[in-house]
A protein has these predicted regions:
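Conserved catalytic core of nucleotide-sugar-dependent glycosyltransferases
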Residues: 214-283
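Active-site-proximal specificity loops/subdomain of glycosyltransferases
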Residues: 138-144, 148-200
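Membrane-proximal basic amphipathic "stem/tether" segments
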Residues: 2-60
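Short loop->beta transition adjacent to catalytic acidic/histidine clusters or analogous donor-positioning motifs
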Residues: 76, 115-130, 153-155
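Short beta-strand/loop segment that forms part of the nucleotide-sugar
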Residues: 125-136, 159-162
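Short beta-strand-to-loop acidic/aromatic patch adjacent to the donor-nucleotide binding site
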Residues: 201-212
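N-proximal low-complexity "stem/linker" segments adjacent to membrane-targeting elements
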Residues: 36-114
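Conserved small/polar residues in nucleotide/adenosyl-binding loops
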Residues: 287-289
Length: 289
């Protein structure tokens, strides 16, 4: 993509014949034209600060230009791991704001639903929700259900059976200490999430029930996945939370431009991330929890 100015065009809503021909020619040649008088991208009828990216087709960032999407996203499955009966895996700590765990769970789900519906382009993408719950009370499960009903969104609930995974889970951590029952149930939930990914079509977002999302979080991840995966020509993993512990040591990295944010390459992450079914199927046998 190349950006050219239109300084010689008058600031008028009346489009002349030559201007129409010029714009059509630019579209054919793959140029995007910015009218510096009106700050419009006239070839796509957008203002300069409007969202110019078209999901599944191209990713546009000003002033860097366009990336043709060669890896379009087909669908997104959001798998939420919930456990409202446990405040923290380490019970001697308190959460920020010191509220009941269900409050964090409900706010997480609500923020995800808002984010999934905030961008009109996401209406063309199949987005499914699945909740894998461990040991929440019936009262709390009803509260979760009411959130989905409020947003008129269907979801699938799985009640976790920890016993199915106990033999696969290591009972001693890297420090040689026994792991707690809460940690075992958390690992079992992760196992179940990965197994559920086999039934998904394309992208999967694994998320714990204590992450608040901005209105553009889902669209940013989708647009960024398409952009970077198309640039690199391979499947990737996106970690939306920039954890402080990742800055405790210096390391060689790479920086990428997403839709509205900069992203950097990391070597590790916690268990809230977005990736593709292809990645899960390729590496599932290598994952040990």
């Amino acid at each position: 993509i190349y950006f050219a100015s239109m300084k010689n065009f008058q600031n008028s809503k009346k489009t002349g014949f030559l201007k129409k021909i010029f714009i059509k020619l630019c579209r054919i040649l793959g140029f995007e034209i910015i009218d510096q008088n009106t700050f419009e991208i006239v070839t796509i009828d957008k203002k300069i600060n409007d969202e110019a990216t078209i999901i599944g087709k191209n990713s546009i960032n000003l002033p860097l230009g366009i990336v043709k999407v060669t890896r379009p996203v087909k669908s997104l499955d959001i798998i939420i791991r919930t456990c409202t009966s446990v405040n923290m895996l380490t019970q001697n700590k308190n959460r920020l704001f010191e509220k009941e765990k269900i409050e964090y769970t409900l706010r997480t789900i609500r923020s995800l639903l808002y984010s999934a519906k905030s961008n009109t382009q996401l209406k063309n993408l199949k987005i499914s929700f699945k909740v894998i719950d461990h040991n929440s009370s019936e009262e709390n499960l009803k509260k979760i259900d009411s959130i989905f009903k409020k947003f008129e969104t269907e979801y699938y609930l799985i009640n976790l059976d920890v016993s199915k995974f106990e033999k696969e889970i290591k009972k001693i951590n890297e420090r040689g200490q026994d792991i707690s029952s809460n940690q075992i149930s958390n690992m079992a939930n992760i196992h179940q999430s990965l197994l559920e990914a086999k039934n998904c079509e394309d992208l999967i977002y694994f998320v714990e029930d204590d992450y608040l999302h901005q209105r553009n979080s889902i669209s940013e991840m989708i647009f960024t996945y398409e952009r970077i995966a198309s640039q690199l020509n391979k499947e990737i993993i996106i970690c939306p939370s920039d954890y402080p512990y990742l800055y405790t040591r210096a390391g060689i990295t790479q920086n990428f431009l997403g839709q509205n944010y900069h992203w950097r390459k990391v070597d590790e992450t916690l268990c809230t991330f977005l990736t593709s079914k292809q990645i899960i199927e390729k590496y599932l046998s290598l994952i040990h929890i």
